[in-house]
């Protein structure tokens, strides 16, 4: 009996010592330890008095630890209250604690390789190209926002991209902003969507040609509050800056462009199931300056710029352009249709009607969806990024497009060209996109000219040729 009591006392002493040794702040509030004490007292390993003593000590320590933790939290919060927040999730951004200001460096690098079959002609070129190399920053100081970005890919000469300031506001009906500087002309979807998110290496023929990208001007935009479903965007512009030292855009400052774009989602189930429709109008007063010449390559960015050409010289009085667009996102599938037409007033050659259209579609094998935001594409987030248990996002895309400049008479308007029209082409492209992470992408496109005619090339090596090209791109942006 004595041995049994001594054993119990010894066991109790050991338990008390062990508990004292391990009763750190983290363990003092551990429910598992309280359960263990209850088991020991039921088995008689410790007395009721010892049990009460240990439980009370544990609770007291727990309250003391919690108090100390709360004090530490309060001190940290007080110390860091005025310090800026730094976030690095995919992009680096510095912002104030109250959200009144933020600053973010931005940039992108696109490197392209092209392998061409010219079908006996000379319209396209093989090679590699640093397609885009941009650096800049963006941010806000409420209620203002700002952006500045330069591209260094044009033979080493920096060129301005976005350079603007905006005033932001909101009403019960939605959000709005008023922007001044160099920014996108509100016309069409293909040009206004960022190159970071376009599903092909090249935009459609009409977007890389006569559609204005950025000009200097003032514009306003309104976005409805209800699920951001409807928007209106309008502005007045003069020619844009071209190089970092350019002040006037090297063009007539009295040339004016007025444009607007309206659109929205008449069908919206959720962000991955929607239908967008849009309409744009653009009026240019050329004032003796040249019409935005359509001077397009067919397949690659470094090809022959005279494949499709509409040159009015300096005789175009004005021009009107109309654009209709439709976009659908249905889970991993997306589709786009866009049609644009130009009516150019030339007092010597007569009025000319030019047109182009494109239809493209894509599908994510890995289940992602194209991200539609405010009438344009936005970034893709792979469900399982590379390096985090997955292989990124994989997407197949296809596009068929046509540009018809056959109504153009390049012999008129003082133009010395011997051409009778600007040409017409049909091009088909199929592509494969791999998104290892949210900010990186590898692209592979195969493009084929299915039909091509241009009277100016009759009897030459490029007469009715149908070239093809395989292109690849590696891109990163931040």
Predicted segments with their positions:
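N-terminal secretory signal peptides that target proteins for export/translocation
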Residues: 1-8
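N-terminal periplasmic/intermembrane-space "pro-region" immediately following the signal or transit peptide
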Residues: 2, 13-17, 26-106, 365, ...
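Short solvent-exposed loop/turn micro-motifs enriched in small/polar/acidic residues
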Residues: 87, 158, 211-213, 317-319, ...
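Outer membrane beta-barrel
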Residues: 90-287, 354-388, 393-410
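Outer-membrane beta-barrel pore domains
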Residues: 121-122, 167, 171, 281, ...
